[in-house]
């Protein structure tokens, strides 16, 4: 079911008083046309007292043939605001794509060996040693596979270290793809972006004003002390930096009341951690400096004169002007004739 593919099954209650730093339950939405029938695409209908379009649940079905749910849409609006940012979430290099941790995890071209063995910097030493022992046990099988693939290169030793490394990666990808399925450990953590966004990095975004090269959104500073500036952007707490002297002066003058002001922020990067926490990095966009403002005010710009338009002529006026012109021409011809006589 694609609706429950991103957020793992949680053991926490639906209404928990403990602080939450990321969504713990999957949100299901129904359309207005099916809300009056209380149809949510589940195995059973929802009681008619529920008026919201968003619910969270623990079990699709129980022994009592009931779905445990709660009407809650707090994280839904955070997801919509994040999608309005237009930022594609990225992943740390050295880890396989969490959407494809099974047989297709070898598609990660940055670190193929770590992707195949499912090893990252957070892996324990015992797990790494266990994976290496499993790889060493495949040495004989790898020789047979290499002999069947290219016996001439193995016989004449006409291969380089890079060729051998590529062959090893290809052999491991085949063996991992045939011997293992979906990693059971991936079912206990957030898969991919947790349904937060499906934007692809490098995608060209258009707007009525042209191509959008930078995401600029309003935000508020949360603290003024220390080098680690925090800002509230789109319902998330982002790591923000500022090198503008104007912004620093405003921070110093306002102190804790800096939260009353809005600043434009450019969101540079966003990535989702294994526990579902969203990390944003943004920079505040400074305004025009005082030096540039003085240069702009010192320049004299000549304003283009306004274009005058001739008034419209009525049909009666045009007829009157035509008669006057005809009389002038007639009198001019008669006067010339008298002089000639």
Curated annotation (Swiss-Prot):
One Pfam family, please name it: Mit_ribos_Mrp51
Position of the signal peptide: none
Q: A Gene Ontology molecular-function term?
A: structural constituent of ribosome
Its GO CC terms are: mitochondrial small ribosomal subunit
Show the ranges annotated as biased composition (Basic residues): 1-12
GO BP terms in the entry: mitochondrial translational initiation
| Biased amino acid composition, Polar residues | 297-312
Which residue ranges does the record annotate as region Disordered? 1-21, 291-317
PANTHER family on file: 37S RIBOSOMAL PROTEIN MRP51, MITOCHONDRIAL, SMALL RIBOSOMAL SUBUNIT PROTEIN BS1M
Q: What is this protein called?
A: Uncharacterized protein in HIS3 3'region
Origin organism is Lachancea kluyveri (strain ATCC 58438 / CBS 3082 / BCRC 21498 / NBRC 1685 / JCM 7257 / NCYC 543 / NRRL Y-12651) (Yeast)
């Amino acid at each position: 079911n694609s609706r429950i593919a991103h957020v793992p099954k949680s053991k926490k209650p639906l209404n928990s008083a403990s602080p939450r730093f990321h969504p713990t339950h999957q949100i299901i939405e129904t359309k207005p046309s099916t809300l009056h029938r209380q149809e949510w695409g589940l195995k059973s209908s929802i009681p008619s007292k529920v008026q919201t379009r968003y619910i969270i649940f623990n079990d699709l079905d129980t022994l009592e043939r009931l779905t445990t749910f709660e009407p809650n849409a707090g994280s839904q609006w955070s997801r919509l605001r994040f999608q309005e940012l237009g930022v594609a979430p990225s992943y740390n290099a050295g880890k396989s794509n969490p959407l494809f941790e099974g047989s297709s995890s070898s598609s990660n071209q940055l670190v193929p060996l770590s992707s195949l063995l499912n090893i990252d910097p957070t892996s324990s030493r015992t797990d790494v040693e266990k994976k290496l022992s499993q790889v060493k046990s495949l040495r004989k099988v790898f020789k047979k596979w290499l002999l069947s693939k290219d016996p001439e290169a193995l016989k004449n030793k006409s291969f380089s270290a890079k060729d051998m490394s590529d062959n090893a990666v290809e052999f491991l990808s085949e063996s991992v793809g045939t011997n293992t399925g979906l990693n059971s450990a991936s079912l206990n953590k957030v898969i991919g972006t947790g349904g937060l966004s499906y934007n692809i990095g490098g995608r060209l975004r258009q707007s009525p004003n042209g191509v959008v090269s930078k995401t600029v959104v309003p935000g508020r500073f949360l603290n003024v002390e220390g080098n680690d500036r925090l800002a509230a952007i789109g319902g998330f707490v982002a790591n923000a930096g500022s090198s503008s002297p104007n912004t620093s002066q405003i921070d110093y003058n306002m102190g804790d009341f800096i939260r009353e002001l809005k600043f434009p922020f450019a969101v540079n990067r966003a990535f989702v951690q294994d526990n579902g926490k969203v990390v944003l990095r943004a920079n505040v966009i400074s305004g025009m400096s005082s030096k540039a403002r003085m240069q702009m005010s010192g320049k004299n710009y000549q304003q283009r004169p306004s274009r005058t338009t001739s008034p419209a002529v009525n049909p009666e006026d045009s007829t009157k002007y035509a008669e006057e012109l005809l009389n002038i021409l007639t009198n001019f011809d008669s006067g010339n004739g008298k002089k000639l006589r």
